[in-house]
A protein has these predicted regions:
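Single conserved hydrophobic/aromatic residue that forms the stacking wall/gate
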Residues: 1-10
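Shared catalytic-loop signature of beta/alpha-barrel
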Residues: 13, 19, 30-155
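Periplasmic-binding protein-like
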Residues: 24-25, 99
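Fold-independent oxyanion-binding glycine-rich loops
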Residues: 26, 52, 160-161
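C-terminal extensions of enzymes
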Residues: 137-184
Length: 184
């Protein structure tokens, strides 16, 4: 739950009482203030996870070095691909921090498998009665990022085919396309 400002965040000390593993992106403005997060960390015990809205290695590293976050957050779709996120993971590891990968998909699974300091696969926006809106049926072979992708041991498999391990289902992509643009 995001806050409008530091006064709102003080009310969020309930996270401490509940023993939550982290408090993610506490500020509604995108959470890019190093000073704001340093100040917040003085008033809550729950570890802070930010950098989801920080779009480059240098700024995310600055936030980690400044003590504004307890975790790094990386997303191959926005943070320089798998390579850019892997660099961020190494920076976090060098500072004794973990990186948590944002969102789901084959690239995210491969990134997590390549990082020894990542813990949780995000199957986002799910509920037992609602599908994951980010899990689009664009891959062949039954790949899924629905709740059932997590096995009985709490693990998620990593595709092992060439590239990211998945082949696109072009028939399904074309069937559900709303428009087509050809660049020449």
């Amino acid at each position: 739950s995001q806050s409008r400002g530091l006064g709102d965040v003080y009310k969020r000390q309930v996270c401490d009482e509940c023993g939550l593993y982290w408090y993610e992106d506490p500020y509604a403005d995108g959470g890019i203030s190093i000073h704001g997060h340093q100040t917040l960390k003085k008033h809550v015990k729950t570890p802070i996870l930010i950098t989801e809205f920080v779009r480059n290695l240098e700024t995310a590293t600055d936030m980690m070095v400044a003590g504004a976050t307890d975790f790094a957050r990386g997303d191959p779709d926005y943070d320089g691909g798998i390579t850019g996120c892997h660099k961020l993971a190494y920076a976090a590891e060098g500072l004794g921090m973990d990186i948590e990968v944002h969102s789901c998909g084959p690239a995210m699974r491969h990134l997590m498998a390549a990082c020894r300091n990542s813990n949780y696969y995000e199957v986002n926006l799910v509920h037992p009665k609602a599908d994951n809106a980010w899990s689009l049926p664009v891959y062949q072979g039954g790949y899924s990022d629905q709740l059932d992708c997590v096995d009985a041991d709490g693990c998620v498999s990593v595709p092992d085919g060439p590239g990211l391990g998945m082949a696109y289902d072009w028939a399904e992509i074309e069937r559900t396309a709303l428009d087509k643009v050809v660049l020449k």
